[in-house]
Regions:
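Alpha-helical scaffold segments in soluble metabolic enzymes
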Residues: 10-13, 37, 66, 70, ...
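Conserved active-site and cofactor/substrate-binding residues in soluble primary-metabolism enzymes
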Residues: 2-6, 29, 33, 62, ...
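Class I SAM-dependent methyltransferase SAM-binding "motif I" and its flanking Rossmann-like core
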Residues: 31-104
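Class I S-adenosyl-L-methionine
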Residues: 1-55, 163, 202-207
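Short, acidic/turn-prone active-site loops that include or flank metal/cofactor-
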Residues: 1-7, 81-88, 193
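A generic local secondary-structure boundary/capping motif
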Residues: 12, 55, 69-71, 95-99, ...
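A contiguous loop/helix-start segment that scaffolds small-molecule binding in enzyme catalytic cores
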Residues: 20, 103-210
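Short, ordered loop/turn segments at secondary-structure junctions
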Residues: 2, 27-29, 87, 144-145, ...
């Protein structure tokens, strides 16, 4: 974290000297990325965006986008995103947010599910979800999305901890809600079309029309 602060301050310092600076952030810089730190530092420096240095944030692809593309359509209705990292946010606050997501029946995307120093967080999170969701609720674990080392498992909330070897800082976990189902290894979160429309045409009707 201190390196991130140093990088941000250095980028701002170069920009204030008239340099064109690119600060690279993984995923989307506006989702758990570097742009928040840049703006916090600038706010502390009383930066004026009208006559101060020019800042442009170029959007990227966050883990919630890349991982959902690999496992079906898990984010078709309302969803929540929670990071398990307690380096900057107290664990007690993270627990409150997890519980709120579980109670609200949100599909939940979990960033930073574990590290070498953090081994209990995901177990505690799973226990919270099991209070409000069925054990067979679909869960996806995606490690290293779109990298050569990519690994994907679609399992259940009950069996989530059976895959501890996949958990780490480049892993994203997606917990389905009460409507999510597993179809041939894909997580599908229905948008609600089926309650309003007939989704697939009847075979006999199609043949007659032809």
């Amino acid at each position: 974290m201190t390196q991130e602060v140093d990088r941000a301050n250095q980028a701002i310092e170069f920009a204030e000297k008239g340099k064109i600076v690119s600060l690279v952030s993984s995923g989307d810089p506006g989702i758990y990325g570097m742009v928040g730190l840049i703006y916090e530092i600038l706010a502390d420096k009383k930066w004026n965006h009208h006559d101060g240095i020019y800042v442009e944030c170029i959007p990227g692809v966050s883990s919630l986008n890349s991982c959902s593309a690999l496992i079906g359509s898990p984010l078709m209705t309302d969803f929540a995103v929670v990071s398990m990292s307690d380096l900057l946010v107290p664990w007690e606050i993270i627990v409150k947010r997890v519980e709120a997501a579980a109670i609200g029946d949100y599909v939940t995307v979990i960033y930073n599910p574990a590290s070498k120093k953090r081994i209990h967080q995901l177990k505690d999170t799973r226990d919270i979800f099991l209070k409000y969701r069925k054990p067979e609720t679909p869960v996806a674990i995606v490690k290293g999305a779109f990298r050569e080392s990519q690994k994907i498992v679609v399992t259940t909330l009950e069996k989530l901890l059976d895959y501890n070897d996949l958990l780490g800082m480049i892993t994203t976990v997606i917990v389905g809600n009460s409507s999510t189902f597993n179809y041939n290894g894909l997580m599908i979160n229905p948008r609600g079309y089926k309650s309003k429309y007939q989704l697939a045409p009847e075979t006999s009707k199609t043949i007659t029309e032809i």
